[in-house]
Every structure is written in structure tokens, then in C-alpha cells.
């Protein structure tokens, strides 16, 4: 809890600074003691020993009560003892200092310990030196030693255990397009999460699906713009679901439904519907062609820079 003015957080460690402040204030109070018409501050005048009479504090301004409280603590020093009248006067400053009454009681009776309890801190302080752990090196050097130890651990793995994996070698055999015609492409970002990592792209050549001619034509008609007639590749993608495996399963189900619909020629085989290639043509037109040929009549070999004397060729010819 934040205590305004810092009046409740003074401990015995900084009591000397409080005493100096109170003594300075007392000098100001007693500087014009012979002149009864003058006072140290605006308002009614107070007796110099008012701090010794807590029973007279009640009814004074809250700021004045707090000043008298600290003055009494500083002047009495080790002879200071809590007083019931003093506590009752301090409780009247609750609204001014924005500190609850119960917290004022804790601070009054327990001091710094009460302030720590109010804040919810740990009062058990262990200021003793830690036992010697045979770590004669400083912390930075200990980290370097730990890194070196870790590197040696992996070096031992590479030297003694990795060669044992040679007995599990298997020759790589590329899957046959006849048995595995469909390709699923995944995108992974190592060490980070990315929304694009859930996207899966399915691609397959329609001739490798093993369909009859009429079923193959119907499949291409149903595929619409997802079929490229120049490469004979059917492609579709999905990032509808959260995980890539879910999107791959979704694409697999869509492909199976397309195949089942293509093989069903009972209702309509779309034999009278031509293949739509407009999307493929538009895609090829959007591509930038860079296979330009330099015209022959633009070439001017007579304007080419003349070859300078090459000393290396001259030396090689003389040998």
C-alpha cells in the first residue's frame, strides 16, 4: 500500500536523518521565543514541549500530529515508548494520509515489520554468506566452463554413438507415381509460429489418377480453374483449419469426392462440354517474357573496343 508523504516508512536505520530534521524545526520554533507576537508558521502558536503531551494532540491538524509524532520519537530516542493517547491522535490522520485505521495500528506497534506485512513482502532476510561451493572461478568463467562441458558431451556422442546408427541405413526409393500420385506440400518456419504454417497444397497430374477417358474429362470439367491444361496438374490448397494435418485431411476428402463424382457417368458425363482454358491463357499472358533476341542488323562489330596488348599471351607464345 502506498503511504503518502512517506511518513510511515521510517525505520531505525534512517532515524538520525529524522532527528536532524526535527532539531532544525525546533530551532525555528525557538528562534523567536522571546517575541510573543510572532509564530514560526501561519496559524495558532504551539508550546515547545507539546510533543511531550500526546493527550493534547487530538483536534490538531493531521500534518501537525504527524510532525509531533516524529519529533517525539526523535527527541526521546531509546527512551521512547508507545502511548495510547498518541495512537488515538494518529488514528485521526487516517483520512488525511489515506491509510486505513488497521494499517496505522500495525505500523505504530510493529514499525517497519508492519509495513512489510501490509505490502505482502517476505520479512525473512538471509544476509549470511552462502557456503563455499568449491567454485573458485567467477560467474562468467563458470558459464564458459559449462559451455565447454556441453560441447564435450556432444563431441562424445558424435564420436562413439553416431557411428552406431549406420546399421539402420536404408536406401531411399522414390515413391512410384502410380502408387503415390498425389503430392502434399507443407510450409514450416523453424523456431517460430506462423499462420502460414497450417496451409497445405495438394497437387496431382490427372493422367496419373488411373481414370478412364470419359471420367478423366469429367474430372477436369469439375476441377474448373484448379486444373492447368498446359501442365496437366490439378492443384488446390487449404488453410481453413488450425493445424496442417486437418487441412491435409480436408483436401484428401475433397479429392475423393471428386474422383467418386467423376467415375459416376450415369447421370451426366459432360462429354458435350468443352474444357475451359481461359484462366490458363490469362495466367500465361500475365507472365513477363524475358527471352528477347537481339536483332542481327543492330550488331556493329566495327564499333567494338580494340583489344589491348596482353603480356600474358605474348609470354606464352614465346615459350
From Swiss-Prot:
One of its GO terms (biological process) is mitochondrial translation. Its main location: mitochondrion. Residues 1-30 form a transit peptide. The keyword Transport does not apply. Transmembrane segments: none annotated. It is found in: Mitochondrion. This is Small ribosomal subunit protein mS35. It comes from Saccharomyces cerevisiae (strain ATCC 204508 / S288c) (Baker's yeast).
